[in-house]
Regions:
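N-terminal small-residue-enriched
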Residues: 1-216
């Protein structure tokens, strides 16, 4: 809707894209799920009273469901999720993330490494830059390790990668069969500002044709 464009920018995603837009390869499945007890941003109901449940945001690569609570669902005329959250009694509920997860696939890490002739394994996010339409991006990592002929070799410090959202995700080739849990206690949004917990879960993933740079 553009309600926050002066605070956090807009999005290249528009309402008419849901249900058919190819966001990534058929291996890409993204869920919004506030229900797992082990994750960082878990609840039973949002602050407008909607019951939390696991919902596919992207299924088999297709953009399916927007992140919007009851008010946004009424405005958009589309189904959404239970994500209207307030940080305290003196703030209104606004659309927020909870646990946004990349669902596991069928590949073992060893299989993914063996499929790579020359590449790099990156871990631990260090820096980020995203344009104001949430389309072009650049991320830096603390640590990387070269992959050569299917084998992990030398360690690389501070590698970076960049791309365009749909192009990047359409080049997803394999998804790992186990997830690692992540989370933050201080995700900020809104005016006046509201800080809440958010969570992520992700397996290892293999991408082709990624623009990698930097590192030492």
């Amino acid at each position: 809707f553009g309600d926050e464009r002066n605070y956090a920018g807009t999005s290249f995603v528009t309402l008419d894209m849901f249900g058919h837009y190819l966001y990534g390869s058929e291996l890409l499945n993204i869920t919004y799920d506030p229900t797992p007890l082990a994750q960082f941003a878990t609840y039973g109901f949002d602050d407008e009273g909607l019951a939390a449940e696991k919902t596919y945001i992207i299924r088999n690569g297709i953009l399916t469901t927007p992140l919007g609570g009851a008010l946004s669902q009424a405005r958009a005329g589309l189904p959404g999720v239970a994500n209207a959250r307030a940080t305290s009694w003196n703030r209104p509920p606004i659309d927020r993330m909870a646990n946004l997860n990349l669902e596991p696939g069928n590949s073992r890490l060893e299989e993914m490494l063996q499929a790579v002739e020359r590449g790099i394994l990156m871990k631990t996010n260090l820096s980020w830059s995203i344009d104001d339409s949430r389309n072009k991006f650049q991320f830096g990592c603390e640590w990387g390790q070269m992959i050569e002929q299917g084998e992990l070799t030398q360690v690389v410090k501070n590698p970076n990668y960049r791309g365009i959202s749909a192009t990047f995700w359409r080049n997803l080739q394999q998804v790992g069969n186990t997830q690692e849990l992540f989370g933050l206690p201080f995700c900020g949004k809104g005016e006046p500002n509201q800080v809440i917990r958010v969570g992520h879960a992700s397996p290892y993933c293999l991408f082709a044709q990624v623009d990698v740079f930097g590192g030492a």
